[in-house]
């Protein structure tokens, strides 16, 4: 869960 554009973060860390 890293804010960069990973798998689950594509909805909140784009």
UniProtKB/Swiss-Prot annotation:
Gene Ontology molecular functions: lactoperoxidase activity; metal ion binding
Main enzyme class: oxidoreductase
GO CC aspect terms: extracellular region
Similarity remark: Belongs to the peroxidase family. Classical plant (class III) peroxidase subfamily.
EC number(s) recorded for this UniProt protein: 1.11.1.7
Its job: Removal of H(2)O(2), oxidation of toxic reductants, biosynthesis and degradation of lignin, suberization, auxin catabolism, response to environmental stresses such as wounding, pathogen attack and oxidative stress. These functions might be dependent on each isozyme/isoform in each plant tissue.
GO BP term, pick one: hydrogen peroxide catabolic process
Cofactor binding note of this UniProt entry: Binds 2 calcium ions per subunit.
Catalysed reactions, semicolon-separated: 2 a phenolic donor + H2O2 = 2 a phenolic radical donor + 2 H2O
Subcellular location: Secreted
Swiss-Prot/TrEMBL keywords: Calcium, Heme, Hydrogen peroxide, Iron, Metal-binding, Oxidoreductase, Peroxidase, Secreted
Keyword tRNA-binding set for record: no
Cofactor names: Ca(2+); heme b
Name of the molecule in the record: Peroxidase 5
């Amino acid at each position: 869960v890293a804010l960069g554009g990973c798998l689950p973060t594509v909805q909140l860390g784009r």
